Swiss-Prot record:
Family named by the database record: Belongs to the MnmA/TRMU family.
Active site: 102 (nucleophile), 199 (cysteine persulfide intermediate)
Keywords, ordered alphabetically: ATP-binding, Cytoplasm, Disulfide bond, Nucleotide-binding, RNA-binding, Transferase, tRNA processing, tRNA-binding
GO biological process: tRNA wobble position uridine thiolation
UniProt subunit comment: Interacts with TusE.
Lineage, uppermost ranks: Bacteria, Pseudomonadati, Pseudomonadota, Gammaproteobacteria, Enterobacterales
Enzyme Commission number(s) from the entry: 2.8.1.13
Region of interest (Interaction with target base in tRNA), ranges: 97-99
Binding site for ATP: 11-18, 37, 127
Region entry Interaction with tRNA, spans: 149-151, 311-312
Gene expressing this chain: mnmA
SUPFAM superfamilies assigned to the protein according to its UniProt record, in alphabetical order: Adenine nucleotide alpha hydrolases-like
The protein, known as: tRNA-specific 2-thiouridylase MnmA
Length: 367
């Protein structure tokens, strides 16, 4: 099928995935143009942000592939739609996932609309590891072939109506295959490391970054028995299930069993810890989720059973979903689950199909 009249704007990040995606689209006879999004003003964040290097890499790839590269600054929109939420949720003691919100508000809303309306594109494309399939006139989001790299977890806020204008060119490939292709076509980014950490922070320590924006109030670290064993540096620095960086070495207990964060008490500004990753105080029988999105609303009939992930790259867990109201659902796990973290997202699956998801409002503790 000749697609030379179909225009695609691909989000170029300067990485190997978007670069190979652009190459695939060119080979499939699309009219391809790239777009580099500047979502963060890095003038004061040189320690954290790699945007300048990423832009340089994107420019070099586009030059080699002979495609035009648009450069757009969405940093104001990112601050208002993503970063302010990120800070507010941390202040509430939750652990948000800004990359999911970035996909929803920036990549698949602001960028999507800019490409379709301003640049008159037929499609947008990204280097995400996910797949889109059409069946009986409807579009479905599926896991990638490379389950280790599958990014459908980050894409659950999409709607079926959007999917018809979105392309994920490498969703059917393994990451190793993508790198091999990049080498064969002579892309210098073939061996570029995958981005790590939150997009605007990079691999640096998040707590150092957050200290620039949130006033840290130190407080007590206490055991479930009420014993004070140390001081925390601000509740936003910790997440449920965390074991490293607690600074409580040498306290009494079974020295062979590590300590974990099991609760953050905002009212008393205390961090509560217990020993063992399967400690009953860390386990949950379910959760309450908010900000729900179903990719294909008409396919959802309550109650129903499916699989779910409460964090990226987690093995799917079986659960039952019950309707509470138009804004909340109750999720009950088949077996207790450790480290359910308010602020993170739970994403639902029926085998390989991503049904949608929501933000974890609260957990239903085992004890």
């Amino acid at each position: 099928m000749i697609k030379k009249n179909k225009k695609v704007i691909i989000a170029m990040s300067g990485g190997v995935d978007s670069s190979v995606s652009a190459w695939f689209l060119k080979n499939e006879n699309y009219q391809v143009e790239g777009l580099f999004m500047k979502n963060w003003e890095e003038d004061d964040e040189k320690e954290y942000c790699n945007a300048a290097k990423d832009l340089s890499d994107a420019e070099e790839v586009c030059k080699k592939l002979n495609i035009h590269l648009h450069k757009v600054n969405f940093s104001k929109e990112y601050w208002e739609k993503v970063f302010e939420n990120f800070l507010n949720e941390h202040k509430k003691g939750k652990t948000p996932n800004p990359d999911i919100l970035c996909n929803k508000e920036i990549k698949f809303k602001i960028f999507f609309n800019y490409a379709i309306q301003e640049l008159q594109s037929d499609y947008i494309a990204t280097g995400h590891y996910a797949q889109i399939k059409k069946k009986n006139g409807k579009y479905f989001l599926l896991k990638a072939v490379d389950l280790n790299k599958d990014q459908s977890y980050f894409l659950y806020t999409l709607k079926g109506i959007q999917l018809k204008n979105i392309l994920f060119p490498i969703g059917g490939l393994k990451k190793s295959q993508v790198r091999i292709i990049a080498k064969k076509i002579g892309l210098k980014v073939a061996e570029k490391k995958d981005s790590t950490g939150i997009c605007f922070i990079g691999p640096k320590k998040i707590n150092n970054f957050l200290n620039r924006y949130i006033k840290a109030e130190k407080g007590d670290i206490i055991t479930t028995e009420g014993t004070i064993v140390g001081k925390h540096n601000g509740l936003f620095c910790y997440t449920l299930g965390q074991r490293k960086g607690l600074g409580i070495g040498g306290i009494k207990g079974n020295y062979n069993i590590p300590w974990y964060v099991i609760e953050k008490n905002i009212i008393n500004n205390t961090l509560i810890i217990a020993q063992g990753s399967c400690n009953k105080r860390l386990m949950s029988i379910g959760l309450i989720a908010e900000k729900i999105n179903w990719i294909n609303d008409d396919k959802i009939i309550f109650p129903f059973s499916c699989q779910a992930k409460i964090r990226y790259r987690q093995i799917d867990i079986f659960c039952n979903i019950k309707y509470i109201n138009d804004f909340l659902i109750k999720v009950l796990f088949d077996s207790p689950v450790s480290s359910v973290t308010p602020g993170q997202s739970i994403v639902f699956y029926s085998s390989k199909i991503c049904l949608g998801g929501g933000v974890i409002q609260s957990r239903l503790p085992l004890l």
